[in-house]
């Protein structure tokens, strides 16, 4: 099965190859697998700075520099991105003690679909299941820089505003897994003009999630 080979999540049974598959062809060549190395790093609680790819790379850079080992790195280009003309979604933080920093950006004209193979492969290498390009890239960035992101369907943000506040007592909220949960006034929630959309830093809501029909998104980055 795909999951047993580490190339997918399907566990329905033995993989059936296409009729044109030539007997004797190496599975690596037929499946287009790349030769790579995965490092499994055991972190102690005091080294949370290493709980990301960039965190590990930063430590390796220091190690190499002390030993005069040349290291090359490249910063990603951000050319081609420009500020749009549309109206932005304002953010109001009503619980700064629980959310000292909250920022967001609206991105329009996205197309939700399968991720490219390179992204799927990198997520599966670290034990994560690819879902779609929007969810996958946020998970990829989480593991790359150690900071979580969350995406809302911008069209589902009632009142075109985002409010960060404490929940009202005994508030009923349905999370992405379809389970109704009861919140307390100790819970921090991300809301639209009327209702909660997300339990901050914990679980997204069923009514604000990205679907195949999503075209505009609101991307959240916060410190809770």
Predicted regions: what is each one?
Residues 1-83, 193, 218:
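Phosphate-backbone binding interfaces of nucleic-acid-interacting proteins
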Residues 1-23, 77, 112-113, 181-224:
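Conserved catalytic alpha/beta cores of large enzymes that bind or transform nucleotide phosphates
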Residues 22-25, 34, 100, 115-117, ...:
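Charge-biased, low-complexity intrinsically disordered regions
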Residues 24, 121, 138-207, 212:
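Conserved mixed alpha/beta core segments that line enzyme active sites in large multi-domain catalysts
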Residues 34-38, 86, 100-102, 214:
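A general secondary-structure signal for short beta-strands and their flanking turns/coil
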Residues 38-42, 49-55, 59, 104-106, ...:
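Structured core elements
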Residues 59-62, 66, 124-128, 143, ...:
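Short, intrinsically disordered, mixed-charge
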Residues 70-171:
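Glycine/proline-enriched, intrinsically flexible loops and inter-domain linkers
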